[in-house]
Amino acid sequence: MKFGVVVFPGSNCDRDVAYVTRDLLGQPTRMVWHQDTDIADLDVVIIPGGFSYGDYLRCGAIARFSPVMQQVVEHAQKGKLVLGICNGFQVLTEAGLLPGALARNQDLHFICDRVPLTVESTNSLWTQAYNPGEVITLPIAHGEGRFYADEATLSEIEDNGQVLFRYAGENPNGSLNNIAGICDRQGNVLGMMPHPERASDPVLGGSDGLKLFQGLLEKVVALA
């Protein structure tokens, strides 16, 4: 399985993600510059965290217009896998690949912490390596991570089983319905505010995030 990690001006988690896919999982991985327009060789595109374009105007608002994003949209429309982490989640909502939006944290402060999450569904490529209802711990680091959607959209997301992760216990940012991560209706696009790549190597204090990536590989092996 070949991974591509998109690099925008201001991205700062791209190498963390590549370390997981290339070094921990041994998968071919290439860094995709924001001006690239050929990603046909990739199976999974990951938009990492950071501050793309300095978060000017609105988080992810400028990044969505980068040349590579049109290719990412087409990649997703073909049913291929796309993962947006933190700022990447914001970019995916701006690009219309995921519903809702990410607004300023309820307390208006930047949050950097480790938080418990409940795995809401394992009927997904992204979460199949977890157990239903499993509580995992992942780092968060964001100032605009409060998931918001209008009532109709929120109901649709819930009814379709698109919520894959919820904050367990205290809601750190005021996200509606404690939402921490959602997928699109097809299930091939995932956006999440917590950072699984920062909890993949036990040396860093936890490996709960590694299963997110391992599940994809297990699916490929099963289909082989």
UniProtKB/Swiss-Prot annotation:
InterPro entries: Class_I_gatase-like, PRibForGlyAmidine_synth_PurQ
Catalytic activity annotation: N(2)-formyl-N(1)-(5-phospho-beta-D-ribosyl)glycinamide + L-glutamine + ATP + H2O = 2-formamido-N(1)-(5-O-phospho-beta-D-ribosyl)acetamidine + L-glutamate + ADP + phosphate + H(+); L-glutamine + H2O = L-glutamate + NH4(+)
Keyword Ligase included in the entry's annotation: yes
GO cellular component terms, semicolon-separated: cytoplasm
Record keywords: ATP-binding, Cytoplasm, Glutamine amidotransferase, Hydrolase, Ligase, Nucleotide-binding, Purine biosynthesis
CDD domains the UniProt entry points to: GATase1_FGAR_AT
UniProt GO MF annotations: ATP binding; glutaminase activity; phosphoribosylformylglycinamidine synthase activity
SUPFAM superfamilies: Class I glutamine amidotransferase-like
Any Pfam family hit: GATase_5
Pathway participation: Purine metabolism; IMP biosynthesis via de novo pathway; 5-amino-1-(5-phospho-D-ribosyl)imidazole from N(2)-formyl-N(1)-(5-phospho-D-ribosyl)glycinamide: step 1/2
One record GO biological process: 'de novo' IMP biosynthetic process
Parts forming coiled coils: none
Superkingdom assignment: Bacteria
Location in or out of the cell: Cytoplasm
Enzyme Commission no: 6.3.5.3, 3.5.1.2
Ranges of residues in domain Glutamine amidotransferase type-1: 3-224
Positions annotated as active site in the UniProt record: C86, H195, E197
Quaternary structure (record): Part of the FGAM synthase complex composed of 1 PurL, 1 PurQ and 2 PurS subunits.
Function noted in UniProt: Part of the phosphoribosylformylglycinamidine synthase complex involved in the purines biosynthetic pathway. Catalyzes the ATP-dependent conversion of formylglycinamide ribonucleotide (FGAR) and glutamine to yield formylglycinamidine ribonucleotide (FGAM) and glutamate. The FGAM synthase complex is composed of three subunits. PurQ produces an ammonia molecule by converting glutamine to glutamate. PurL transfers the ammonia molecule to FGAR to form FGAM in an ATP-dependent manner.
NCBIfam families xrefs: FGAM_synth_I, PRK03619.1
Protein name per the record: Phosphoribosylformylglycinamidine synthase subunit PurQ
Protein encoded by which gene: purQ
